[in-house]
Amino acid sequence: MGKPAKKGRRPACLLPLAALAAGLLWAGNFTVGLTEVSISSGKLPAAFEGFRIALVTDLHNRVFGPDNDWLVARLEKAKPDLIALSGDIADEDSALSSLSALLPRLTAVAPCVYVTGNHEWRMKNRAEWFSLLEKSGVRRLSNRFARLTRGESEIIIAGVDDPNGPRDQKTPGQLLREVKAAAPEDYIVVLCHRNDQLENLANLGTDLVLSGHAHGGVVRLPFLGAVFGTHYEFFPENTEGVICCGETCMVVSRGLGGSRRLPVRIANRPEIPVITLHCKKT
């Protein structure tokens, strides 16, 4: 007769694998990666060669490390000249305590600009959130634009509020016409939440678009990429990276937080793209 099988061996062998899977899942949701992106343009003034923009989006009030120390440390490491907050930093049902501590630390790293995301227009404490941004020194570009200067040179950063906002708010077309009237030759960066505006903004004369919203597709699979779209359709496009339309490029961040209905990210680590601008020789 053969020796009886030892009970419990197989489950015990699976424990290290389960621990590894849990660790990878945790790291894939609560650690932050920096993604270096280079964008070149013949329109960029020489004074802005090497200008760095950190794109922070879709935090949804998630906390990375004690008091968001890990998130701030990543931004300090990136050494940005500007931090662009492209919406859904807050979440519709969350308290603002962690963000009230975080925002002043962000503005201590670099000047910050902000546009709304779709969830922030659903907040019951939206007025408190907007007030907190102002008190923390974050500049809200609510369908407005600002000039960024270096020496005697300038570029434009324009902010497009999310369409979940007021029905009578200024359209991207109206905003870009104002920009073109004020600075017809300037390099134009548009900060917006949604990742579906590239063609429209390209036609309006934008040079660079910074966006988020897609959460990188929430789940990413080898060879297939993003699994879920923002309307829960399968295998959406333009959920991360650099996408170009003519001379206009859009940087889409995978973002930092989780979807409300699909809160767990899989093979989709939270990220902060850091965009370095370069002068392209013509």
What are the residue ranges of the model-derived segments?
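Conserved beta-sheet core of the metallophosphoesterase superfamily
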Residues: 113, 195-273
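Membrane-embedded segments
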Residues: 47-144
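Beta-strand-turn-beta hairpins that frame and shape the catalytic cleft
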Residues: 40-54, 139, 145-159, 183, ...
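Short, flexible loop segments at the rims of nucleotide/cofactor-binding pockets, characterized by
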Residues: 59-64, 89-93, 163-169, 187-188, ...
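Catalytic metal-binding/acid-base residues of hydrolase active sites
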Residues: 60, 90, 119-120, 145-146, ...
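N-terminal membrane-anchoring alpha-helices
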Residues: 1-47
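Short, Asp-centered acidic motifs that coordinate Mg2+ and/or phosphate
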Residues: 81-82, 113, 138-139, 155, ...
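Binuclear metal-dependent hydrolase catalytic cores centered on His/Asp/Glu-rich metal-binding motifs
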Residues: 130-131, 135-138, 144, 150-192, ...
